[in-house]
Amino acid sequence: MKVKICGITHPDDAREAAKAGADYIGMIFAKDSRRCVSEEKAKYIVEAIQEGNSEPVGVFPEHSVEEILAITETTGITSIQLSGEDILFKFSHLREHFSIFYVVSVYSNGQPSAALPPMNDAVTVVYDHIGGERGSPFDWKAFSPFQHNNWMLGGGVNLWNIKEGISLLNPRGIDVSSGVECPGILRKDIFLMQALINSAKELSSSTL
């Protein structure tokens, strides 16, 4: 079970997430996000996890290929998360350079908002609740993932519902942001991160 801790805004949080066993550390570059980081801050975050096994992921919802290449070169980011328009064009120009995550937005009723573009299992699909930052899950019982083996469950996963999500859907990984945050300050709670990552790893072992 892979775990991505997303919306990291501080190097100390990244370091603690990596120590707790997070596989991926996500940094958001969307200017309209409260969790948006600058290139300078992202570089410090990447440096904070260099000695561990966590992989830095840049979240680029509407950036051009040129912008993504420039930011990743400056920061040292090695994986990217994409969404938005011109996705096939971006795949074709970026897949040789990066591991890629692709976001599929899901309505509250569990229905994906759009069909899945053509892609192979090297791309990790992340299912996220439309509205993104509300911190509540979509209807997992009504949800069926596309025929794509490599996918993560996102959008409202937390320590109190992770067991239900994994037992219902058996994802390859989980993507968590607000579910491990300290209230009101956009910093991660070290103990929540540790507990959630441990739960994810233990639950995935029990479902094998």
Swiss-Prot record:
GO terms for molecular function: phosphoribosylanthranilate isomerase activity. Keywords: Amino-acid biosynthesis, Aromatic amino acid biosynthesis, Isomerase, Tryptophan biosynthesis. GO terms for biological process: L-tryptophan biosynthetic process. Its EC number is 5.3.1.24. InterPro entries: Aldolase_TIM, PRAI_dom, RibuloseP-bd_barrel, TrpF_fam. Coiled coil: none annotated. HAMAP family: PRAI. PANTHER family: N-(5'-PHOSPHORIBOSYL)ANTHRANILATE ISOMERASE (PTHR42894:SF1). This is N-(5'-phosphoribosyl)anthranilate isomerase. The lineage of its organism: Bacteria, Pseudomonadati, Chlamydiota, Chlamydiia, Chlamydiales. The gene is trpF.
